[in-house]
UniProtKB/Swiss-Prot annotation:
Record's keyword annotation contains Plastid: no
Organism whose genome encodes this protein: Yersinia pseudotuberculosis serotype IB (strain PB1/+)
Pfam families (UniProt xref): MukB, MukB_hinge, SbcC_Walker_B
Protein function: Plays a central role in chromosome condensation, segregation and cell cycle progression. Functions as a homodimer, which is essential for chromosome partition. Involved in negative DNA supercoiling in vivo, and by this means organize and compact chromosomes. May achieve or facilitate chromosome segregation by condensation DNA from both sides of a centrally located replisome during cell division.
Protein name: Chromosome partition protein MukB
Amino acid sequence: MIERGKFRSLTLVNWNGFFARTFDLDELVTTLSGGNGAGKSTTMAAFVTALIPDLTLLHFRNTTEAGATSGSRDKGLHGKLRAGVCYSTLDVVNSRHQRVVVGVRLQQVAGRDRKVDIKPFTIQGLPTAIQPTEILTELVAERQARVLSLPELKERVEAMEGVQFKQFNSITDYHSLMFDLGVIPKRLRSSADRSKFYRLIEASLYGGISSAITRSLRDYLLPENSGVRKAFQDMEAALRENRMTLEAIRVTQSDRDLFKHLISEATSYVAADYMRHANERRIHLDSALVLRRDLFSSRKQLVTEQYRHVEMSRELAEQSGAESDLETDYQAASDHLNLVQTAMRQQEKIERYQSDLEELTYRLEEQSEVVSEASEQQADNEARAEAAELEVDELKSQLADYQQALDVQQTRAIQYQQALQALERARALCQLPELTADNAEEWLETFHAKEQEATESLLQLEQKLSVADAAHSQFEQAYQLVVNIAGEVSRSEAWQTARELLRDWPSQQHLAERVQPLRMRLSELEQRLRAQQDAERLLQEFCKRQGNAYQPEELEALQRELESQVEELSLSVSDAGERRMAMRQELEQLKLKIQELTARAPVWLAAQDALSQLSEQSGEALEDSRQVTEYMQQLLERERETTVERDEIAASKRAIEAQIERLSQPSGAEDARLIALAERFGGVLLSEIYDDVTIDDAPYFSALYGPSRHGIVVPDLSLVREHLQGLDDCPEDLYLIEGDPQSFDDSVFAVEEHEKAVVVKIADRQWRYSRYPEVPLFGRAARENRLETLYQERDRLAERYATLSFDVQKTQRTHQAFSRFIGSHLAVAFDADPEAEIRLLNTRRGEIERALNAHEDQNQQQRQQFDQAKEGISALNRLIPLVSLLLDETLADRVEEITEELAEAQEAARYIQQHGVSLTKLEPLLSVLQSDPQQHEQLQESYVLAQNSQRLAKQQAFALTEVVQRRAHFSYTDSAGMLTENSDLNDKLRQRLEQAEAERTRAREQLRQYQSQFTQYSQVLASLKSSYDAKRDMLKELSQELVDIGVPADANAEARARARRDELHAALSTNRSRRNQLEKQLTFCEAEMDSLQKKLRKLERDYHQIREQVVNAKAGWCAVMRMVKDNGVERRLHRRELAYMDGDELRSMSDKALGALRLAVADNEHLRDVLRLSEDPKRPERKIQFYIAVYQHLRERIRQDIIRTDDPVEAIEQMEIELGRLTEELTAREQKLAISSKSVSNIIRKTIHREQNRIRMLNQGLQAVSFGQVKSVRLNVNVREAHATLLDVLSEQQEQHQDLFNSNRLTFSEALAKLYQRLNPQMDMGQRLPQTIGEELLDYRNYLELEVEVYRGADGWLRAESGALSTGEAIGTGMSILVMVVQSWEEESRRLRGKDISPCRLLFLDEAARLDAKSIATLFELCERLEMQLIIAAPENISPEKGTTYKLVRKVFQNHEHVHVVGLRGFANEMPSLPPIAAELQQGG
């Protein structure tokens, strides 16, 4: 029996508390005992790290973190290490007794992330005497050691003979070696496998029922049926390969299409260019002839245009000179019209201002009188107001003084003083020194009289002044009129000047009245003069155009001559038009006919090509449509005969294939059901027993056993009897022979041998005579010999079938070609040659075109003569009415005479217009000018003196009145009398004051009224004077401007000036129009000459170039033609229908084909290079070389073994036939490869049944497991309902869903997924692909549901869940599940590792104190029965009598922390105790 591998020890180097510690592991249970923080979990973490060094999985948490998804940042590993290099190694001895040290080098990585670097390694072949700590550390002193780095460790190990050190960069490689050496139970190929293994270790470490494992028990317990899956994958791979082959055939067919496309595009590419060059060569020849003809005609036309240019230049120079004169005249006429219009506006202004001045003069006189009267009233009112003010002031002063005197005792003195002051003031004002209070009243009367006298004198002077003002105004008005008319004149000469002006006035009026008749007469004469000048200019132009000098009297005879010439030319032009129309109609008919034939020619040529191909294919000369239809009927008959023969060959081929399939069965069974029956009966096929018989003995044994040679040899027939009941799935005759399959011989028969036959005595009364078969099939050698013959026959039939298929398809293609020809070309194929008709029509068209060109030249000359004659008649029609005007020679003198008379009349009219109103006003005032009223100023001075005298007299009278009024103040008798007098005086003063104030108020109000009125009158007067002065000045300026203008200001003058301006404008416009016309014609002529010169240069250049091209192309074309004929491709390239396409269409066709060819030859370097070279337009022969290269390339690709032609086109057709045959064969092979749904269902069911039995066997090992109230543990396996339905449908109702499994578009997996979705529409498949779902459905594990159950107390069997069990029960149940998983893994992996390897079994259990003694004993028993190692961690030694126990105590010594370890071997009877292990290494620095 193979011994199971064991873990010997665990070594920790430089871990937290362990500098270099090796734990020897017990063969069953190793217990780590110690208090909290002693290092138990660290020791287990080191073991797990060495076992699974995957940082993505490692997460060491304590039990308080159970179920947590995250712990400390370093996942619990960084904090368990010391700074520097750390190691964790496992010393293992496997089933082969090979010692292997596996472990990891760990090192903290500096940084905030608290990362740890891990490097796995293995050491093989290490001697048993050497401990792991000895090679991992180096002694530097008696009690000090140093940890070696990984390179140093490698050097030390490699220095040992026979020891191998291996470092791993991949965890997968590390685990692969561990699996091969039996360290781990399962091959961990991927991270998912490592995750499963880690979850199992983690579940055992922390105890309990792991949900991560129970949820995915199928993945842990059920092995992957790789054989079945591989069978399915191989089957699908074969189908996929078959379909890929079919797809490759389709690709090959597309390549065939590509080759056809290559030939077609190459033909289009080269033929289009070939025909384009042929067309261009013909076109270049025609173009050279056309260019030469155009060159001669252009030279002739250039000479004509040059002559026209000279003539038009001369005429343009004359028109330009005339235009300059007309522009000058027109500008003068426009200026004259502007002056006349300006003068008319000035005259209107003068008349308007004169009327305004007359009105202003009248208003000014009236306003002057009003202002004078207002001035006098103003002076009177001012005097009265001033006197009233003085009187009021005096009375107020007196009253104030009086009031003051009443208030004080000096009132009298004040009044007396005031009286004296009034007296003094009166004396001074009146100049009377002798004035006293007594004679004041007398003097008052005297001065009242003076005042009255001064007032009367003032009134007299005022009346005289008004009369003088009137006389003075009339004289000034008359004098001003004389000055306005005659200029500055002395006042004494004014009357004489005015009388002379009035005497000349009637003569001036008479001259002014003659202005209008003279203007009309002058306008008429000027118009005739201008008409005469225009007629002379027209006559000069006419003579220049006619080239002769004509007199006016000769014009009528010339007109008759030109009219007769026009009539003749008109008839000639009309006849020429009809003839030209007839030739053009004939030419159009020829062009239409040529176009029709040109459109028909490609169709006819294509029909001829198709007819030629049909003639070549059929070998018959097809001369009419009847022969075509007859040969088509012959093709149909030939096709029918060949098809019948091909079908017979196909039937024979299928029969041979059926024989081959039957003979190819394993064990020589002709019926596959015999193999199943042999397995069912526990027997062996007789053919399998004699499978090694030689080919020489095969006939004998075949005859010996006869029909029973397909029987089954069974050990005991009696055991088979019960299986025969109800047996229906078997052959009609089933032979069962009793015997030992291991030592079977033919002694059971009594045999007599004859020549080529045997007689077999079956029973006493029954014999069987059997001849040797001509083709023996008994034994593998005979079958192989027969199969070889059948293979040869099948190949021969296949070749014959292929030949017949080719003939059928060739006949069908020929028939299709005839059908296409009849449908497309039969209607035109036997018509007359359109190209011959086109050549005849082109000859006739050339003749007509030449005649038409000659006719056009002659017609052009006649039309020019006709146009010149019509133009001459038109000019004569304008000149003949002007002949009399041309003969009038006195017209200019009459115009000059009338012009002088009109100037005098206009001068008189201007004088009357300017001074007529003034003379009219002056005539009644002529007598006033005889006397000058110069005394007017003296009267004004006397009037001012009289006003002053009157004002002084009033003031003197007022002063005397005040003295008289104060006369009582001069004497006061006593105070009482003074008071009485003062009282009276007060009343009087107050009364007078009231009267004086009222008088003053009235005077002020009246003064204000008169002042306002006077101001208004003065303002009006000033405004009138200002307006009068302004208008008078403006009138003078306007009159002066009118004189400066110097043109008459009347309506007729404006009309004449406008008419003159319009006539000149019309003449100028006509001249400009003619000049512009000449300039345009000259520009057109110059442009035509330039274009003709450019055309001549271009024609000469093009002619020389095209001639050179024709010469050069001839040599190149000869080389191309020689190359085409030498290689026999002229028939394919010279496609006459392309001759009817223009160069752009052919170039476009060639370019399109070039683009397609670039894609087609992209993967062929040779053709790509040749194609690139052929793109040179200057080397057309390279395109021929490319076409030849394409044909050569396709010829080289022809398989001469299956294709019997050198023509690539025919080879492509034969290739298509061969591809069709391969497609049929592969389609048949795909049908054979397809697996039935029922077979799939049976395979999956068998696998499920096998795994259910295996789970039952695993359950038997767990029935005796007991933890607390849990008496037993088992695993239930059930088939899911939906998947069971799927299996039933696959096995019994597969016919209903053949649309899925017979689809060529779906693989079997996809069809299975579609069926599952069809049976379970309520399920959501998510975003998964049908292929993925189908692959899952091919995995039997997805059909099963696994569930762990426990038998617990009175509850019976219930589902194992942590919530329903105690902690110890859950730990024990979980451990049982893990043991079952490990066993399952070992069984699953048994075939993957060596047969002499039994892997190590080890699990963990942290915090085992939660289990009672009975549960611990159960664990020990389980480990012993299963040969499993277990590492337990507990605060105390839970079972000191069994296994090995380590007591761990963490101590601190000199600021250094280390773990003190004491080992104890169990002391039970069956296992003697070992002395304590106290040796340990002291930690070094």
